[in-house]
Amino acid sequence: MLRTTCYCLLLAFFSMGTAAAQRSKDDSQETKLLVMEHLWNEAQVNRDSRALDGLIGSAFVNTEWDGEVSDKSKFLADIKDPQFKPASMNVQGMKVTFYRTTAVVIGEYRTKGSYQGKTYDHVGRFTDTWVFQSDKWVCVASHSSLLKK
């Protein structure tokens, strides 16, 4: 009986240590993902398709606020479009949820700029799905929904 009790206590102790280590690892990965989200926004404002190319996976799919769906090549081409002139993009209220080697980041955004000579000021929510592959996080899907025009 004593042996069983000791075994259970040791198992509980090591499980708590493993859970704490996992939380620490998740916190570190969460910080990385939040930084990458900010880098993504900076790259969009600077129309830096090369930086964005390094953040998104080869099978990336993007669903815009207006319902347009694009793959990686179209998304990157749109960033380079000279008629696309973003002035600012800010995110807030981000939350990261992990599912083993996948993470979902949700948050709110506000972006201002002009496209084809027309100004825009969008406020919305986004969902980005990131996968850890080849020792790095890459975004494989992004979706935005407009809250206010």
Regions found by a protein language model. Give the residues of each.
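A beta-strand edge to alpha-helix "cap/lid" segment located at domain peripheries
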Residues: 7, 22-149
